Amino acid sequence: MFADINKGDAFGTWVGKSVPRREDADILAGRAEYIADIKLPGMLEAAFLRSPFAHARIVSIDVSQALALPGVYDVMVGADIPDYVKPLPLMITYQNHRETPTSPLARDIVRYAGEPVAVVAAINRYVAEDALELIVVKYEELPVVASIDASLAVDGPRLYEGWPDNVVAKVSSEIGDVDAAMASADLVFEERFEIQRCHPAPLETRGFIAQWDFKGENLNVWNGTQIINQCRDFMSEVLDIPASKIRIRSPRLGGGFGAKFHFYVEEPAIVLLAKRVKAPVRWIEDRLEAFSATVHAREQVIDVKLCAMNDGRITGIVADIKGDLGASHHTMSMGPVWLTSVMMTGVYLIPNARSVAKAIVTNKPPSGSYRGWGQPQANFAVERMVDLLAHKLQLDPAAVRRINYVPEARMPYTGLAHTFDSGRYEVLHDRALKTFGYEAWLERQAAAQAQGRRIGIGMSFYAEVSAHGPSRFLNYVGGRQGGYDIARIRMDTTGDVYVYTGLCDMGQGVTNSLAQIAADALGLNPDDVTVMTGDTALNPYTGWGTGASRSITIGGPAVMRAATRLREKILSIARHWLQADPDTLVLANRGVMVRDDPGRYVSFASIGRAAYCQIIELPEDVEPGLEAVGVFDTVQLAWPYGMNLVAVEVDEDTGAVSFLDCMLVHDMGTIVNPMIVDGQLHGGIAQGIAQALYEELRYDENGQLGTGSFADFLMPTASEIPNMRFDHMVTESPLIPGGMKGVGEGGTIGTPAAVVNAIENALRPITNSKLNRTPVTPDRILTAISAGACA
């Protein structure tokens, strides 16, 4: 815990407090600078021409009219891409996976509607857009594969020449003897779950600026990315530029949710274009481009077979997962499919399990990271199966869950391909039911049903993969680099402190939380700590950047270690000056004092001046300067967990769903900033509700997007989001210094299953139809009511 590291003096003053986010004032006042606000001298604007077809051969491209338009500086097409340019790399590779080479601009074949085929540099965006209309492209349309079923058809079209099928990779995991478990069980049943295609949809779209120096040797990039170091590495590899000559800066991000955790084709394209025109070039993605070119997510079909005994104990599970990667394996598209496959036992002690997952390609934009990665899909399938099991056995779904949890005494516990480090699932379960008022809700439900009202109660329990990730584990599973984090901390001559981290702040408040950690270690106010992010020239290398609930679990301990080392150096100087026993010294009031004699005090400013300027005043064994570096690389993943409980009312005439109660009880370990944590949970639950009820990227059989704007791609607003209740059970992580477990994806994972379980529970008196496809829209609810008479 924090107090142990700091020997109890000022430590714990700030960690655990709701310190207001320091960035909010600038954002609310319109002073915050995003990438669209950056203007460089002589900067040109870029616009991309994108394929209108989902699958076609490029016969010819004529750019002559576009080049003749006043204000146009250049038009670049696939044929202009130099031969030395390499395909975009992957962050994770999987055994026997097939390559899907991706060029900055399509050269011969386009594989999704929205794939870039040309890019224009012009004096402004208006001229660039006008020039796009003057580019003449002749296409030869090819057969389209627009769904998982079509992709897996034996005699269907292949997206890549020479492939025997459309499968990029296949992964599998197995424990126990599934066949024997199925043969000896009292009950065996199976279901198919269809999870829709989603879009992270951050408020700020992507943006990118490339600027070469006057010699054309050094590259400056401003990129709205969550992964500045990986962006530099990828750019170096793709364009054959030494990484030392590339500087990546990520300004303030208006959200990411995983969408900005990828390296996109537009990025090297803009760099090449800027070199051709010998001027800075900026590209700001418009909303239509965001829907058709920024990564999609979630789409899977999961077939589950489960066996159990009559008392509700689950003895085996088999899962067959098919994930739609879109047109290519993009940065880490396979990752969510793999994670779904290894999470198919959930939080339950299921001794026999088999999971097989296929990642397939279709003529849709690439898919990839979105808050929760593959966990919401796995949780939805498993938690829906538990509810259906309870219904078949006429048991309470809460009771069925409780007898199946991995007990605390079995921790650490290894499931399909992961090890839970710890967990008090039964304790949290009991606490959640009591706090939610489960028994009272059951009584209220019975009374409402007697009046013909359709009230339903739903629940789900999840464990979240966090502290991503152990470097050796990542390398073992095919990651191109480790998941450690490095932090550098410096105190200047005034006593102010600067923390440098490779993490990025995309609205989640990480700079606040890191400042609180550093402030506690040094006896400062968080306002005295400036956290510097988003610049490869200033910030240390970090293994994975911001995402996967790793900022506080990996970045936090790195800052803690750096601050503790700086603290030790400060104390060694102060001890020399104050001639005091080290155990009597306290860091407080921007200095060091003797605990029982506060008049004996030396300021940080005095220590800073000595460390940097008056070196003669330092102890002989102390080097000049006040800087320290901290590195943290966990040996194992951390596992926060929680239980979602929801009460809804369904209007059986309209299919409308109203929330009556919405609660999450969770254990994320030590809470650094409760206000920020609650904000993370609010947003995560909202996105979970969106997946359950609203959002869907719908494609027709020709691979054309029918929901390419916020008018059609529905997202819940403040009017649709219910009031939420949270309860925090704190059990410190045994692996992470400080005890943190992570929270960034927690609200998202279990919400869809809880909401759909509640809706189905409400409809049980009038229909036997099952709601196994999301989103559960009003028309699907009405169809379920009309299709299934209650037995």
Curated annotation (Swiss-Prot):
Temperature dependence (free text): The caffeine dehydrogenase activity increases linearly from 25 to at least 66 degrees Celsius. An incubation of 30 minutes at 70 degrees Celsius drastically reduces the enzyme activity to 11% of the initial value, and 77% of the activity remains after 30 minutes of incubation at 42 degrees Celsius.
Catalyzed reaction equations: caffeine + a ubiquinone + H2O = 1,3,7-trimethylurate + a ubiquinol; ubiquinone-0 + caffeine + H2O = ubiquinol-0 + 1,3,7-trimethylurate; theobromine + a ubiquinone + H2O = 3,7-dimethylurate + a ubiquinol
InterPro entries referenced in this protein's UniProt entry, alphabetically: Ald_Oxase/Xan_DH_a/b (IPR000674), Ald_Oxase/Xan_DH_a/b_sf (IPR036856), Ald_Oxase/xanthine_DH-like (IPR016208), AldOxase/xan_DH_MoCoBD1 (IPR008274), AldOxase/xan_DH_MoCoBD2 (IPR046867), AldOxase/xan_DH_Mopterin-bd_sf (IPR037165)
Pfam families: Ald_Xan_dh_C (PF01315), MoCoBD_1 (PF02738), MoCoBD_2 (PF20256)
Cofactor dependency: Mo-molybdopterin cytosine dinucleotide
Gene Ontology molecular function: caffeine oxidase activity; iron ion binding; oxidoreductase activity
Role this protein plays: Coenzyme Q0 (ubiquinone-0) is the preferred electron acceptor and, to a lesser extent, coenzyme Q2 (ubiquinone-2) can also be used, but oxygen and NAD(P)(+) cannot. Is involved in a caffeine degradation pathway that allows Pseudomonas sp. strain CBB1 to grow on caffeine as the sole carbon and nitrogen source.
Family to which this protein belongs: Belongs to the xanthine dehydrogenase family.
Self-association state and partner proteins as the record states: Heterotrimer composed of an alpha (CdhA), a beta (CdhB) and a gamma (CdhC) subunit.
Name of the protein: Caffeine dehydrogenase subunit alpha
Organism in which the protein naturally occurs: Pseudomonas sp. (strain CBB1)
Gene that encodes it: cdhA
